[in-house]
Amino acid sequence: MDASKLKKVAGKKFGGPRKKSVTRSIKAGLQFPVGRIGRYLKKGRYAQRVGSGAPVYLAAVLEYLAAEVLELAGNAAKDNKKSRIVPRHLLLAVRNDQELGRLLAGVTIAHGGVIPNINPVLLPKKAAEKAEKAGTKAKSPKKATKSPKKA
């Protein structure tokens, strides 16, 4: 390159095409904003100092949890033959997963409803017997045999 053809720009040696900025999210291969999370960590005054790896790690953890919940909620929506995830699907996804259920045990999801559950003791006996038969293999009915008469 000929230096005489390029204009001199204030603060830089020569002007020219600007480099595309590479964010820390791109470097880490994440979708969640590492810079914004770092700013929140500093502003929140959780500690006097924040290490450079802390926002990257936190962004990765948050992204993983979000992806996990969304995948399970998408499966719940598909099971209900719906194409849109609603709070009910989020609740079903979280409560039916053991680890997420423990993590979010004290969390109330607005408009999520409750997990359907009926205690077997409260079910009518006929329904309970049918449920038991459905659970086990149905056997073919045997011919009734008379018991011997007592003399």
Swiss-Prot record:
It holds the Pfam family Histone. One of its GO terms (molecular function) is DNA binding. Gene3D superfamilies: Histone, subunit A. Phosphorylated within its C-terminal part, probably at the SPKK motifs. Residues 139-151 have a biased composition (Basic residues). Residues 129-151 are annotated as: Disordered. The modification N-acetylmethionine is found at M1. It comes from the Eukaryota. A motif (SPKK motif 1) lies at residues 140-143. The nucleosome is a histone octamer containing two molecules each of H2A, H2B, H3 and H4 assembled in one H3-H4 heterotetramer and two H2A-H2B heterodimers. The octamer wraps approximately 147 bp of DNA. Contains 2 SPKK motifs which may interact with the minor groove of A/T-rich DNA sites. Phosphorylation of this motif may regulate DNA binding. This motif is reiterated in both termini of histone H1 and in the N-terminus of sea urchin histones H2B, but its presence in the C-terminus seems to be unique to plant H2A. This is Histone H2A.2.2. It comes from Triticum aestivum (Wheat).
